[in-house]
């Protein structure tokens, strides 16, 4: 048991290291656009999240948009969609609740969901799981801050101004799910993309690492 714990600590330290973060960064940059062809969007142009969200909504003719985390409406106010719901407990959006509170009471379904709330692995994981429950058929889930540039940008608790949190850990975990197709695009600190369909590029790592 002690050996197992020792190995787990080593793996966690390795996954948090600068080298592995850089490896993830260039892996996503090189390979992940292949599974996104049906969106008819070139993520290699490195557009910002507003351009990406609006372009996808327009090309897929989405009608209902949900945003989790709307700080100062930097994105929410400029998204062009017929029906918009923005959830934030502090500022922005049009629903003043935590994402957990919102999902517990929500009965609506959405075509496009953008997650940019609390940037911790545990909360992002919950936000993804809850979003899947309310995603319309053919819809898409997008996440911000999936590719931190260095160790300090993802350190939790936060230790510097520019902070992506450990959102990337949730992306890695959901890439092991057979029923979800997950990608990360090299744009705007990493835009995660989740489709509710069979995984086309399953990430399989040893069970003892989970």
Question: What is each model feature region?
Answer:
Residues 1-114, 118-210:
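A short alpha-helical cap/connector motif
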């Amino acid at each position: 048991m002690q050996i197992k714990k020792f190995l787990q600590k080593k793996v966690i330290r390795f996954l948090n290291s600068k080298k592995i973060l850089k490896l993830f960064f260039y892996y996503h940059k090189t390979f992940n656009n292949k599974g996104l062809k049906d969106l008819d969007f070139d993520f290699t142009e490195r557009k910002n999240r507003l351009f990406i969200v609006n372009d996808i909504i327009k090309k897929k003719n989405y009608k209902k948009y949900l945003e989790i985390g709307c700080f100062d409406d930097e994105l929410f106010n400029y998204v062009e969609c017929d029906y918009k719901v923005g959830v934030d407990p502090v500022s922005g959006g049009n629903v003043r609740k935590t994402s957990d509170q919102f999902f517990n009471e929500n009965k609506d379904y959405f075509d496009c969901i953008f997650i940019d709330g609390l940037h911790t692995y545990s909360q992002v994981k919950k936000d993804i799981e809850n979003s899947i429950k309310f995603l319309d058929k053919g819809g898409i889930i997008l996440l911000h801050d999936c590719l931190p540039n260095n160790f300090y940008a993802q350190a939790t608790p936060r230790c510097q101004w520019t902070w992506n949190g450990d959102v990337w850990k949730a992306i890695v975990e959901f890439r092991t799910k057979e029923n979800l197709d997950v990608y990360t695009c090299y744009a705007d600190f990493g835009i995660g993309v989740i489709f509710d369909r069979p995984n086309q590029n399953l990430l399989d790592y040893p069970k003892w690492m989970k």
